[in-house]
Amino acid sequence: MQIVLISGLSGSGKSIALKVLEDVGYYAVDNLPATLLPELVAELSDTGHERVAIAVDVRSGASLLALPQQVEHLHALASDLRLIFLDARDDTLIARFSETRRRHPLASEDVSLAEAIQSERDALASIAELGHRIDTSELHANTLRAWIKDFLAIEATEGLTLMFQSFGFKYGIPLDADLVFDVRCLPNPHYDLRLRPFTGKDQPVIEFLDSFPEVGRMCEDIRRFVATWLPSYARDNRSYLTVAIGCTGGQHRSVYIAEWLGRHFSDTLRVLVRHRSAARRIVDHGADMADK
């Protein structure tokens, strides 16, 4: 049996993730108390279900504390067990709840939204370390759907997948980054008005950055560092290693370098390249992500 556990903060997109799994053929169960996991899995196994997706979150109350132990128990019941933890920055979660006017499950007359988010983050801290974390702070719902599908495809294979992720420091460092490189010291195409509308994937920006030797040295230095330490990360039984490349706005330099690194590692490894901030102007932080 294949089991995917979904957890994370309220408003981070758990309902979207669960619906993606349901759409691709998983039997989906939402808001299950953690203590009932073994019983449910045993029953579904007896009735012939081969793929199951279960959402477990803070609404489970005190039973949530049992989840780490239940995960260990489920490894004995499932041939393939994965856990996805969805996260987002506090300001993003506050904006999503404010825009949709949904109530946070831990908020009350005496507990503000910000306090409720912090309480939930504290309660889920140990669970966040159990699985693959996805920071949805800058993700549109359609992008999250694509990332979940990528995760399912990658996890079905053996070995480590290397993800290069560009971002803008002005929007915050991605919560799911394992390694972070700051490339704001490089020449900035933003100050050339002709280049400003483009991204680091467009030829005019590529030619601009290619003309500076320090850009090539930065790319090579990052490549060498990742290549040197990649075997150590792989020995840690990881499925993913997320390398985040940041510039000021996440549109030009970081995109260029993430693409460069992706090309140079793709001959020998499974590689994904993602750009968090390059299309930020079309990102919707509100209604479609504030699920519950």
Swiss-Prot record:
Q: Which SUPFAM superfamilies match?
A: P-loop containing nucleoside triphosphate hydrolases
Q: List, alphabetically, the NCBIfam families matched.
A: PRK05416.1
| Protein source organism | Aromatoleum aromaticum (strain DSM 19018 / LMG 30748 / EbN1)
Residue numbers binding GTP: D57, V58, R59, S60
- Which GO MF terms does the UniProt record name? ATP binding; GTP binding
Q: What is this protein called?
A: Nucleotide-binding protein AZOSEA20610
Is-annotated flag, keyword ATP-binding? yes
Q: Which Pfam families match?
A: PapZ_C (PF22740), RapZ-like_N (PF03668)
Q: Which UniProt keywords apply?
A: ATP-binding, GTP-binding, Nucleotide-binding
Q: Where does ATP bind?
A: G8, L9, S10, G11, S12, G13, K14, S15
Protein family per UniProt: Belongs to the RapZ-like family.
Q: Which InterPro entries match?
A: P-loop_NTPase (IPR027417), RapZ-like (IPR005337), RapZ-like_N (IPR053930), RapZ_C (IPR053931)
The job of this chain, per UniProt, is described as: Displays ATPase and GTPase activities.
Is ATP-binding there in the keyword field?
Answer: yes
